[in-house]
Amino acid sequence: MSSTEKLPTIASPQEIGSLAPLPTFTYAPPQRSDLAQLVALRVYVDGLSAQEPKTAAVIASSFVFNSSILDNTLRSAGIPQPEGPKTAVTTFATVDKRDGFSWAALECDYLIVADPIQYHLGEENQHLVTVLAQPVLEGTGIGTAYRRLDVSFPLQDGVTVYVYERTRDIAPEEYQAISAELTALYPEYAAQYHSPV
């Protein structure tokens, strides 16, 4: 240090009159533009159990719509969970090589399906979603067991969510068709896709 440079002055504790308060700021995460539609969907789904308990499965897996988004909508919007009936939402597995097919979804009273079909890892890694969502949306194959209710929920990014009511039991051959389709894609994971009937 040269003789012309000054050392910084440090105040003693007695010289500090008072500490400045910590700066105040608030941070609110961005709010979804479709939050009202998500709330309406959650309320509608729970209303399906008004007369008797019902079950549903969400057949979608993207950052726009998935089962966690449906489950947490009211809480994230700061809306208290209302008293009264609540439709039980069954877990639906969505990752091909990690998860087995969620056969319990085929026993649910309702399927909640997004159009276009929603993925977070790409269609090539989420055939579990496609194998059920596509025929339900198209009304073909196993999709003939479901009737689309007269309600839709438009979400962000051009996604629309529909609710389908199961109108009949799923036939053993429909279970087996799902098993065969998934096993053909991943023969080494056949045990994960084995039909229970």
What name fits each language-model region?
Residues 20-58, 63, 67-197:
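C-terminal luminal/periplasmic domains and tails of membrane-associated envelope-modifying transferases
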Residues 1-33:
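Transmembrane alpha-helical segments
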